Curated annotation (Swiss-Prot):
Its EC number is 4.1.99.28. It comes from Microbacterium sp. Activity is strongly reduced in the presence of chelating agents. Optimum temperature is around 40 degrees Celsius. GO terms for molecular function: lyase activity; metal ion binding. Changing residue 313 to A: Almost loss of activity. Optimum pH is 7.5. It is an enzyme of class 4 (lyase). The gene is carB. This is 3'-dehydrocarminate deglycosidase alpha subunit. Belongs to the C-glycoside deglycosidase alpha subunit family. Carbon-carbon bond-cleaving enzyme which participates in a carminate degradation pathway. Cleaves the C-C bond in 3'-dehydrocarminate to form kermesate. Also shows weak activity with other C-glycosides, such as 3''-dehydropuerarin (3''-oxo-puerarin), 3''-dehydroisoorientin (3''-oxo-homoorientin) and 3'-dehydromangiferin (3'-oxo-mangiferin). The active site is at 147 (proton acceptor). Gene3D superfamilies: Divalent-metal-dependent TIM barrel enzymes. Mg(2+) binds at residues 145, 177, 275, 311.
Amino acid sequence: MTALALPRLGVTLYSFTPYYHAREYSFEDLIRIAGERDLGPGLEIVGYQSIKGFPKLPDGFVKDFRRRVDEAGLELSAMGANADAGIPHDRLLNEDELTEYMAHQLHTAKELGFPIVRVQHSVTPDLMERLLPLAEKLDLTMGMEIHSPHSVHHPKIQALVERYEKLGSPHLGFIPDWGASLTRLPPSALQTYAAADVPRELLDAYDRQWDVFHAEGVITTDAEQGAQFRRMRELNERFGGDDVSVRIGTNAVGLFGHQRPEDWSAIMPWVVHVHGKFYGIDENGEEPSVPHGLLLRQLVDAGYTGYISSEWEGWHWNTTDDPFEMVAWQHRLMRRIFGEIEAEAGVR
């Protein structure tokens, strides 16, 4: 049998946030190291995190950026745009202001050479439709990130599906974030907080409560999410927690989603990019909370050949492991699974 068409691997520089925030490495260093350590070929950046003054670009920046990407042997996969409607301190941006805010970022993405722009849920179906002519003119694809606590079942995402079906444009799509499809709380988070003297009884209570939420299924309203936050805060107080320990409870609600992996099939025709979110790799080379085998097989079965950006978010609590090595471990895991898929298909 001829070779299967497989997704391509890459990385988002967001995975290396601790190094960047600590100024251990510059933006330019991270591009170079991603190439040197074979963490590409796909390269994704978050505009506002990576470039001072974004979306304005300094003189000569584009030429220098493209040269560095080429020298690193990388390919531009996606640029993360922000859709922060709460920029003013006393109000939210209105739709005209948010349209202008997003349009500027689309122009910058084009100038930098990115084919795909990640957008966030503040961008409504109406706003996506308003931005579509510009995206088509610039030959850009806008991908709405589906990030925990949202899921393919959330009304905001369902409304976008309806609008996509109406508009029928290849310049509109979705970006699944695997953090929406966990099977358990990340063990590395529990271990880190235990080492920080968070009471074991509290961590066990969080773990059990997350399992209860998981059995109940995805949330579809802000009220449901608020109730889950309150429940975790109640546990924190009951078991003698503090401002540190409450973080894992809030993360359990906001970051670690309950969507069934197979449910991504509902939006698979519109998948234009993937955030390969992960939190840790165990001694067996597996990610214990994110079901990589199921997720990758689903992409292969759907014929998806775009990029998967490795996105290590364990840095929120894990300050000891090397982010570069963590991404390398995930790439090894994904390549191993691709090999298993090819073997099952009889590929030689």
